[in-house]
């Protein structure tokens, strides 16, 4: 297995690309920037299965020439958005451990930030393996155990003496992200291998400083408002009113990249794995 450490310049180019989709949602553009940069080292073509497809906008940004794509999403509304996008030839409303497609029928599969949310991980990976042709690959991004370990907001609130509020914030954060599988890197590799895959490429994403600031932004964004909804519904229009924000936030990410000291220990990972039988 090759470990690919991303140069800072590639992460920043990733931000330049994804900020066009999410210019005023900083936690989303930050995380997606690392994923985008990682996928530049992957190649998918032919008939493609997108597992947990959502609305297809990010898929189209990463793989603009892909034109034979089938999506799967268990959420009816997300699946409908995928159908309306024009990205997919077909979108199944189905759980990923029960994909209504034939054996050995896809050249590649893609699962962006979806596997960690799925309750039947071994079944999902086995189903992706079943659908892939021999030699086919899965490109995917996932979170690791550090995603929880480095969550700053509950820790800071607890340090201020508000233990009950800290526990509530942590629960809300985990409930929102529905993290069924915040595995270690070794745990992810073992899961892929159990399903019959061999891991060819691992790209660590979001080391400690990037991850800590990302988690703080994301946690604040999703804090529940007393009046209903999330704090993010107040933050986004505030940021949207400033046309300088996307470029200014790029400078912040650049500073965080300069601060990193360990690029292997990260809260996320991007993998390329291959079906070997």
What are these regions (language model features)?
Residues 118-122, 146:
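A structural helix-start
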Residues 113-117:
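Short catalytic micro-motifs in class I SAM-dependent methyltransferases
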Residues 156-157, 190, 200-277:
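A C-terminal cap/extension of S-adenosyl-L-methionine-dependent methyltransferases
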């Amino acid at each position: 297995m090759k470990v690919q450490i991303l140069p800072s310049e590639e992460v920043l180019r990733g931000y330049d690309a994804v900020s066009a989709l999410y210019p005023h949602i900083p936690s989303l553009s930050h995380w997606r920037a690392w994923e985008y940069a990682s996928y530049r080292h992957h190649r998918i073509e032919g008939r493609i299965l997108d597992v947990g497809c959502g609305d297809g906008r990010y898929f189209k940004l990463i793989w603009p020439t892909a034109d034979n794509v089938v999506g799967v999403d268990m959420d009816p509304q997300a699946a409908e958005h995928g159908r309306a996008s024009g990205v997919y030839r077909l979108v199944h409303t189905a759980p990923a451990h029960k994909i209504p497609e034939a054996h050995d029928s896809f050249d590649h599969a893609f699962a962006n930030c979806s596997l960690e949310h799925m309750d039947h991980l071994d079944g999902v990976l086995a189903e992706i393996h079943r659908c892939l042709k021999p030699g086919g690959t899965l490109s995917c991004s996932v979170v690791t155990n550090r995603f929880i370990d480095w969550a700053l907001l509950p820790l800071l609130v607890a340090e201020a003496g508000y233990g009950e509020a800290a526990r509530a914030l942590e629960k809300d954060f985990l409930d929102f992200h529905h993290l069924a599988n915040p595995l270690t890197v070794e745990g992810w590799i073992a899961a892929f291998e159990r399903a019959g895959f061999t891991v060819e490429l691992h790209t660590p994403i979001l080391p400690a400083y990037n991850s800590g600031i990302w988690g703080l932004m994301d946690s604040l964004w999703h804090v529940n408002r007393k009046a209903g909804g999330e704090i993010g519904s107040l933050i986004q229009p505030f940021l949207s009113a400033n046309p300088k924000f996307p470029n200014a936030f790029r400078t912040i990410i650049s500073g965080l990249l300069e601060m990193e000291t360990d690029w292997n220990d990260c809260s996320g990972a991007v993998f390329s794995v291959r079906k070997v039988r």
